[in-house]
Amino acid sequence: MFYINRNKQNFSLAFSYLENKSKNNFSFGSTKSSSKVKKLNFIHKIDNLFLMEIIGNKKNQSNWSENFQDKNYQITDYSINPTLTYFSGENNRINFIYKLSDIENSIGNQETLKQQNFGISLFLNQKEKRGFISEFNYYKNEFNGDINSVISYVMMNGLQNGENYTWRFKFQRKLSKLLDINFIYLGRKSNSTRTIHNGSIQLKAIF
C-alpha cells in the first residue's frame, strides 16, 4: 500500500494491491480460485461538515472447477465509487453514495454487466451507550447473458437483472459494561421477486 499525504486534513491519496489464490480438493474434483484488486482511494476534507471520497477499483476474479464447467469464469470489474459524507456532531453522519461498475466475463458465454448503485446511509451514536445504522440502496443492473447461471449470480452479487432495492437497519444498545444487544433487520426487493425480510437479535458478552 502506498500513501500520499496520509492523515492530513485537506486530502490524502492511497494505492493498494491485493492478491489471493486458493485451491480445494473435493470428492467430486478440484477447484481453483484467484483474485487481484488494484484500488486508488482519494479523500478530500472540504470543511468541518463535508468529506469527499472517490475510489477507483479494478478487480480480476477467476474460478476453475474440474467437473463443473458452468462454474468457470474470468471476470474483470472496473468501478468508480464517489461518496459524499455530511457530519452532524461528533458521532453522527450521513453518506451519499454512487457507484458505477462495468463487469465482463472473458470466457464461456462472455457475459457483461453494467451496474449503477445509488445509496444513502445514516450513522447515529450516543457516547457508546447506543447506536443506530440505516442503509438504503438502489441498484440498476443491465446484464447480458443467462440470468439463471452461476456467473450471473457472481457478477450481480445475488441481485436480479433490472431494478433492485436493498435496505438495512441495525440498533445497538449497551446493557452493561459486559453486555451488548443488537437488533438487525435486512430487506431486499426486485421487479421479478417478492420482498425478502430477514431479522435477527444478537446478544454479545464481553469478558
Give a label for each model feature.
Residues 1-207:
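Exposed, low-structure sequence patches enriched in small/polar residues
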